C-alpha cells in the first residue's frame, strides 16, 4: 500500500522484562530506586566515533561524588575502554560504580537502561536501545551525522561540534579520536546533563 504524505512511522520501542530485571538487580547489587546514570563509551568503529575516555572519566567522577550510581555498559570489545575509565577513578569512590561491560546480553542492557535517570553515549547501538526504552539520553556525535542516525526519542539530546557527515581524514584525529569529539568538553556535557535532568518531558 502507498502511505499518505502525512503518515508518521512510529519510532522503535522496546519492552522491559520485569523478571529478568529483578534477577539482574539481585546479581549485580545495584538499586533501581537510587539515581543512576549509564555510560556507554564504546563504538563499533573504534576511537574515531568515541568521546575520549579521559572525558568520560571526568563525568563518572562527578556523578560518583554526587552519590549517583554509575553504570558502564558495552560489549566485550569495549572492555579496554571501560577499564581505562575505571582506572581513572580512585578506589574510595568506586562504591557506586558498576562495570557491566562484557557481562550482559543485549536483552539485559534493555532492562538495565530502563532503570536509569540519564544515559550518556556515543553514536552507537546502545544509544538506539536507550532511545527505544524512552529514558533521558545525551548523545555525542563526531564523524557521523544525527540527520542520518539519530536517537529516535523526544527524550534525546545531542551535542555535535561539526556539521554534517565528517569523514575521518589524516589531520582530523587527536590521539585517535575525531577532532569534533575532542572539542566537546566535559564541562559542557555535565551542564547539558544537568539541564536535561531537570527537563519536564
Report each predicted region and the residues it spans.
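Leloir-type glycosyltransferase catalytic cores
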Residues: 1-24, 153-201
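Gly/Pro- and small hydrophobic-enriched strand-loop and loop-to-helix capping segments
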Residues: 133-161
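Short secondary-structure boundary segments
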Residues: 41, 123-124, 142-143, 162-163
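CheY-like receiver
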Residues: 24-28, 59, 112, 192
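Mid-sequence helix-capping/hinge segment at a functional interface
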Residues: 1-48, 86
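Donor-binding and catalytic core of enzymes assembling or modifying cell-surface/extracellular glycoconjugates
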Residues: 53-142
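Glycine/Thr-rich phosphate-binding loops of Rossmann-like dinucleotide-binding domains
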Residues: 47-48, 80, 129, 148
